[in-house]
Regions:
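Conserved ATP-binding/catalytic segment of the ANL
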Residues: 129, 143-144, 148-203
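Conserved C-terminal "lid"/linker of ANL adenylate-forming enzymes
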Residues: 226, 234, 265-304
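Adenylate-forming
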Residues: 156, 190-219, 246-256, 272-278
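Residue-level signal for inorganic ion chemistry
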Residues: 22, 82, 135, 189, ...
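Short hydrophobic/charged patches on amphipathic alpha-helices used for structural packing
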Residues: 11, 64-67, 168, 215
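Gly/Ser/Thr-rich phosphate-binding loop
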Residues: 20-23, 33-121, 134, 224-225
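C-terminal boundary motif of the adenylate-forming
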Residues: 138, 182, 220-244, 269
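ATP-dependent adenylate-forming carboxylate-activation enzymes
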Residues: 1-17, 209-214
Length: 304
């Protein structure tokens, strides 16, 4: 690619290459879905038809075919990883029968820890531990109470090169690699990530708040392109970079954008526990800085 990876540029490239398997970060699939799928199914009549047994299945198949075609049309499955996949987007992919799966890993594990074939994908999970890899949730109740995800096996590194201190904080004496991620695991071994332990926030009364879960909901709200949830004192604030294409199309002013964000805040709060509700949404004037895998560099914004 010689241009910025916009949905249009990506779809053109994939149409040319026609890959047999895709491994992508969530940002890519979310952009393509919002560009190629959502505009076609937002109509109230279409939503109603999609709920009807026979007609609905036909529409879903057509939507799935369109999305498959937009991604080259030649792949066995799309493997998504590197960050959390938006729950609403995933539920849509699952509902239309799209061939996707979500994996989880780390560089220290070369890099895969969990994976499921698309035929066994469970919505919200990142699969089960791969062959030769043990996995454990460090929690008294791994099904219901999030704990740190630990793993050991042939994929796990021996240690960090010439850094015994870092190795000692990550690998324990029993060979378990401490991922720093928090999650739960169901009876079948499917892992559900809640967020990073270092990202977890504490409410005024000691409640655990996972900002990623709030961000997942906020990212589905009107005009939201990218978002972060941060703590300012004891208050939670949503940082939002708005969708510039929509702003231009609708001819929105700054006051219009502020009003939409306040409406978003009022709409999202009833779906959150009282201790996790947003007190404000701040509009950012430029995109968030990101890592090479397109995750937002959270540490740059949490201390402002």
């Amino acid at each position: 690619l010689t241009k910025v990876a916009s949905p249009t540029v990506l779809m053109r490239a994939l149409a040319d290459v026609k890959p047999c398997i895709l491994i992508v970060v969530p940002l890519i699939i979310e952009k393509v879905v919002r560009k190629a799928v959502l505009p076609k199914i937002q109509d109230v009549r279409v939503k109603m038809l999609m709920k009807m047994p026979v007609i609905g299945q036909s529409i879903k198949q057509r939507v799935c075919d369109k999305l498959t075609e937009a991604l080259g049309g030649n792949f066995y499955e799309v493997i998504i990883g590197g960050a959390a996949l938006n729950r609403e987007i995933e539920e849509l992919l699952h509902d239309i029968g799209f061939r996707y799966t979500v994996g989880y890993g780390a560089t220290e594990c070369a890099p895969i820890i969990t994976y499921n074939d698309y035929t066994r994908q469970v919505v919200g999970s990142c699969g089960r531990n791969v062959i030769h890899q043990e996995l454990m949730i460090d929690s008294p109740d791994p099904v219901n109470i999030p704990g740190e995800i630990l793993t050991r096996g042939l994929n796990v590194m021996l240690g960090y090169y010439k850094n015994e201190e870092a190795t000692a904080t990550t690998l324990d004496k029993d060979g378990w690699y401490h991922t720093g991620d928090l999650g739960t695991m169901d009876a079948e071994g499917n892992v559900f990530i809640k967020g990073r332990s270092k990202n977890m926030l504490l409410g005024a009364n000691g409640q655990n708040i996972y900002p990623e879960e709030i961000e997942d909901k906020l990212s589905n709200m009107s005009l939201v392109s990218e978002c972060l949830v941060v703590q300012r004192g004891q208050k939670l604030v949503g940082l939002v970079y708005p969708d510039q294409e929509q702003i231009a199309t609708l001819g929105l002013s700054e006051s219009d954008i502020e009003a939409i964000m306040e409406r978003n805040r009022q709409d999202i709060n009833p779906s959150l526990p009282a201790y996790a509700q947003l007190t404000a949404i701040k509009v950012m004037d430029k995109e968030f800085e990101k890592t090479p895998k397109k995750s937002i560099k959270r540490f740059l914004y949490i201390k402002e």
